[in-house]
């Protein structure tokens, strides 16, 4: 019934199995991939014809984690998987980025890749396995895909590279580096790094590329036995049309790209495009003309040629800079004084308002992942409204790009955050991109660093970021610092680097062509280091160290530790005690299972009142010490006094006064404030108090005074 083909290899100390022919046989390509006991199914399907009017490549990648893969049932009312989680969105992008450039130029048929996690062993992360399986499925599908790609995760543990570390090993790693590439070249890098050098990171990229070769060979071997016939697709030869268009508007495009202001340049480019389509496009007046959509694609090629040759031939870029110069930078802090921390970061025509908000443990984000549930106390949200590029457009929930850019900035900043013990706040950063002309994610990194310092977050060191680009031709190449949006779109590489004065914290690279050598990457990292240092210097002019304390409008938080066996007493039956503490003092109290108590409020007096109350419950009263107390009940043999938080003790009638007291009610009333000394505890553990040895006016210990008089 099944024609099963299987390829098994040992990879990084684990067994990788790629299988096809048993599941999802109606898909163009389907691969069941297993590593350890993690199982992923990847399918690839493509349309056999192009939709009329299609002028872009409609590739969709959907990565989905089924909760049954970890033996769980979804939370929520409906008990089924809903909208993609942040991780699913990020892994979908991770798979998309290295495979998109490998489809044959001009192919615009719809392609959908679906990667489904069927089983998770809680050791081997399914993201790398999903990338490998997606690559294999595309190679089997017959689509015009110039793969395969391989992928690998690299850690840095105890000074050594670790291939595809387990989730437990990643906790000890100083680097989380994901690399994808073909047999000949690296195509994509994504990482989070704890201030390592450029040499170590680049070494990790090369190590990953070497180690993924075995996977690439395995996919090729599987495809030789199971791939479908290649889809017949021949890119159309448009050289003749391109030559006509160049003669017609080549000079106009060159003139347009000498205009430094973005909006004016776009108007000039748009006018040249309109002129080309009017002259060469199909119309009633020109029945032998060409499809306007085809002309638009050719016009874009001409744009790229003009920009690229201009940079390589003259060393000057669209806005007149040389390849290493960073655009003018201005950093400002405290621009929104009632927020907890704020910054405006402007670099050329790219600008971000970043606001930091500090919260308590109640504000942490609860995340239900396959690996288990946890709370995240550092949040970064990136928003890219259409007005930032002078356009109208959709507003609403964030798209994949916004989620991806926000996560990149999050990874760059997280290694520099203080520990929870040193700074027990939840931190939320919101980056509003108000202008964009390239590298808005790196503007978010810089603005976020300033906003957190303005909020009093004790960062280990400030973080700056820069986006690099590349123009690569047969006769030479140029590495570009601080790229514009056009240089990103028309160039060969988008290379984002973030870090401190001591090392890198994040690196993201997307390469659109083959042929990027380690030497080129090394030059790009070295040039980026210079750019980062310059940007950091400009940021330091606005603020070079965190404020000494959080702002007036931020909540104040103090942390204390209590014995774990006292937690129940602080909470009380059904939460009665802790609710009373919160209601009476106005402070928020958060108690962890390990006895760490976080108390927060808008002012310090409320925090002190709550902490004193908690300590009165958890601390032991000290024999011989004098306390303020309140009479809570008067009886024939004395009075019960509340003197230490929730603790009550008995003042026996003989201990009320040095004079004889016949009836305690003649001397004491309920609610009366008194001063008492703790004498000790009786055989049953009951507390014994005394009023007569304490001066009720001054609180002086009279017994010590009498003892001193006797000695004299």
Curated annotation (Swiss-Prot):
S1 motif domain spans which residues?
A: 624-692
Which family does the record claim for this protein?
Belongs to the polyribonucleotide nucleotidyltransferase family.
Supply the gene name: pnp
Annotated Gene Ontology cellular components are: cytosol
A Gene Ontology molecular function term of the record:
RNA binding
| Top-rank EC class of the record's enzyme | transferase
Query: Mind telling me which Pfam families this protein's record contains?
Result: KH_1, PNPase, RNase_PH, RNase_PH_C, S1
**Native species of this protein?**
Caulobacter vibrioides (strain ATCC 19089 / CIP 103742 / CB 15) (Caulobacter crescentus)
Which compartments does it reside in? Cytoplasm
Q: Which HAMAP family match?
A: PNPase
Q: What is this protein called?
A: Polyribonucleotide nucleotidyltransferase
